[in-house]
Amino acid sequence: MRSLICDSPPAIVRPPTTAARNEGRVIEMRSVNKPGGNYLPVIIHSGIAYVSGQLPRRGEDLLYAGKVGANVDIAAAQEAAALCADLCIAAINHAAGGEDRIVQVLQLVGYIASAPGFTQQSQVMNGASDRLIERLGERGRHARTSVGVAELPRGAPVELNMVAAVRE
């Protein structure tokens, strides 16, 4: 069994397929976010990549904050979820050597900071699922769980973690 542990992402990741579309604009994935604590951003073991939770941020800057159903609407939460999906792919790109090494996204788990009574977590997660299919085609189809929570780190509205099969 082979394990690859990625504990120090570079400042810039530039595989050939790092452009992501967001409402007609192209966003280039220039960096992999460093972890906010004593854990690894991704581990690849026996052809399976386990990506730690990703917040909608660039470096230290949180780009979305608040609770969905209170001060964050569904459209903004979907954008945040799409960004988190891009960051999951960027983490795998760094650890595995490129987006083309992703064989299949297996599972996506999304945590949505939800106002009391908000029950449309699955709608929020469609932003991430749509982004994965847009970028990876059929390789981006996955099993998914959407969980409403009271709070997330740094006040983020969305956090995603991913499991994917990768070519070693």
Predicted regions and their residues:
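Short, polar/acidic, helix-capping and beta-turn segments at strand->helix junctions
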Residues: 14-168
